[in-house]
Amino acid sequence: MDIIKIALTGGPSGGKTMILEKIKEYVRENTDYNLIIVPETATELSNNIIRPQDVLNAYDFQNTVFKRQYFKECEVDDVLKYNDKKKNIIVYDRGIIDNKAYLNQELFDMLLSSYDKKELELLSNYDLVIYLESVSHYDNIEYGFNNKARYEDKKSAVQLDNKTVEAWLGHNNLKVVRARENKQDKIDDVIKIIDDEINDIRKEKIENYELDNESDLSIYDDNNSKLINETDYYLENIDNKDYKYILTKRSYKNSFSYIFKTVKYNLDEKTTINEKNISEKEFLRIACKYGVISIIEKEVLSFYYDRRKFDVISYDGKKRIEFIYDKDLKVPSNIKLKKKIDDMDDFINNQKKFIKKLKI
């Protein structure tokens, strides 16, 4: 069964309600996928039971949201077991990680522990996360109040919007969709992302720079960024030498997730084909099937600045920063760029530890 799980998230006035309707139209009119929409849990509670501003503390409300959201997501998984549709897209109007936007890392960890869950485990349940930037960041775009459950003023909305995207920084396929004056442009951006996911291919114009040692990364912690350890296993590929078959094992706080993807670098363009979250069992099966020829161990620090996502990748003795190309992009003052990396294949090859044969 082909299942694509998409979390649609964002702060107040990000346009989720409007874009959800457009997603419904697109999927039903242009694909052969069955579409399942999982409604927003916090809004259900606010409209029918209790508003977040009426509770004694944020933790109690988020605990209730978490419990209901987790039940709904499990319920959808159960339904799919006896669904006769072979191809399904599930769109979650906010996912379970959105709870973190209202709690600090310590409280969120406590919440997860009470349900015996791990953050990375929950993140890997989604194939794609689409973050819709709120118009509250801009003075030239109207900030609306079409959702009756909304209670934030514009300043609070900006803060909540930033906390929302920061909550999802640990996801390997997080897409940031900027707010636009023309709503149709934002809709088109979202549809393009979903279309790429359906077709198992995405091309991104990226830039990579080596970092100077004077860069200060000490300002980042679990409350404003995400640091994940990753090991990339490069597999033998006799089918197409231009593409790299890569298995990735990710780890965070004694939790693990696994990814299989095919990647090609061409100057400033990165092409990714068929990136999927997989089980540990599937990870081992694929490794045995193709054979591992080299590995790279690294740390990936993801942070959000000036409404853009950055990844700092640390190897043994070297650091680089990667981001989607944007002519208006600003790099934070604590980040010092050394030089642009023009040949990513060459740079990555220099970080590899080559082996004759790896038994996993």
Regions found by a protein language model. Give the residues of each.
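Conserved lysine of the Walker
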Residues: 16
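A glycine- and Lys/Arg-enriched "phosphate-lid" helix/loop adjacent to the NTP-binding pocket
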Residues: 106-169, 180-181
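NTP-dependent small-molecule kinase module
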Residues: 2, 156, 160-206
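Hydrophobic positions on the alpha1 helix immediately C-terminal to the Walker A/P-loop
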Residues: 19
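P-loop (Walker A) phosphate-binding loop of NTP-binding proteins
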Residues: 11
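Conserved substrate/cofactor phosphate-moiety recognition/catalytic segment
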Residues: 24-68
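Phosphate-end processing signature that detects enzymes handling 5′-triphosphorylated RNA
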Residues: 198-360
